[in-house]
């Protein structure tokens, strides 16, 4: 199994966790499921996902709290929000707070898989870009007294 296809699912609804876990595993993803945001945060000390799919409204630490944690500490990990509360204000709030995408419940499993796949592809491209930028910067030498740069 590719380590770059690690998806974490956080939802307080057991049936949603079951459907997503089964569907995503069948689609070739490595999946971990969590009942709430506290479980996700506790697991971050041990491992990290390549993408987080989280319910917006959960008891305890909810999806917006997780989004804030990921935005501040793991900004390279895409967060996809899920909710049955698909009003425009909620959607705008999620995007303004750094959500990569948004899935309204009830959802189509193929749509969820497509959004996760796109998030993983974009993450991979951003990582490649960052590596190339670092490589280019390592080739540049800046002379401190003159501030001239050479390659």
Task: Annotate each PLM feature.
Residues 5, 35-36, 62-65:
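Acidic catalytic/metal-coordinating carboxylates
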Residues 11, 55, 83:
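Active-site residues of response regulator receiver
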Residues 17, 59, 83, 87:
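The feature encodes the CheY-like receiver
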Residues 18-26:
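Charged docking surfaces used in two-component/phosphorelay signaling
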Residues 28-35, 43:
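Short hydrophobic/Thr-rich beta-strand motif most characteristic of the beta2 strand and flanking loop
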Residues 39-42, 64-75:
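Short amphipathic alpha-helix used as the core "switch/output" element in two-component signaling
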Residues 140-151:
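Single conserved hydrophobic/aromatic residue that forms the stacking wall/gate
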